[in-house]
C-alpha cells in the first residue's frame, strides 16, 4: 500500500506491506468476510532409523492427500516425520488438536505408533469457502493475497510474484485471472458463521471417513 503524508515542506510517499492473513481482526471487512481463521498443527517425530524410513517414504516424497481436512507430510533432512493436517475452529481446544494430529499420523503410518513426538507447532491459517486463494486489489492501491487454505508454502511464492509484477507493470493477466474468481462471504455473519462452519466441517470429515 502506498501512503502519502504532507509535512509542509514537501510530500512523503511510503510503500507499506501489512502482513495479516488469518489475523485481520476487523482491519478490512471487505476481504475479512471471505476468509475463516482456523487452527492447524504439525507434529515432528524423533529421528527414524533407515528400516522405518524405507517402509513409509522410501523415495522421500512430499505427500498431500485429498481429504477435506487434508493431511500433508514428509521426512525432514534429519529423518524425522513431519506430519500436519488436523484442523480446528474453536480456537480453544489446542491439546485436542495436538492429540488428533498424532492419531491421524498413527492411522496413516501404524508403524510409527510407538515413536515419540518431539516437536509440535501450529497456529491460525485462513481458508476460503472454495479453498482457492483470494488475490486481488482494493481501491487501486492495495494489493492483497490470503486464504491459501493450507497450501501457503506452495502458493505464497506464486502470489508474491503475481503481486510484485502487478506493482511494477500494472495489472497483469495473472492478477486479473485471480480477480475473476468470485469468492463468497462465509455465511452466518459474526454470530453464526463459526457454528455453521463447524457443523459443515464435521459433515465433511464424516465423508472423508467413509470415502464419499
Model-predicted regions and their roles:
Residues 27-29, 54, 93, 154-155:
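Short glycine-/acidic-enriched loop or helix-start segments at secondary-structure transitions
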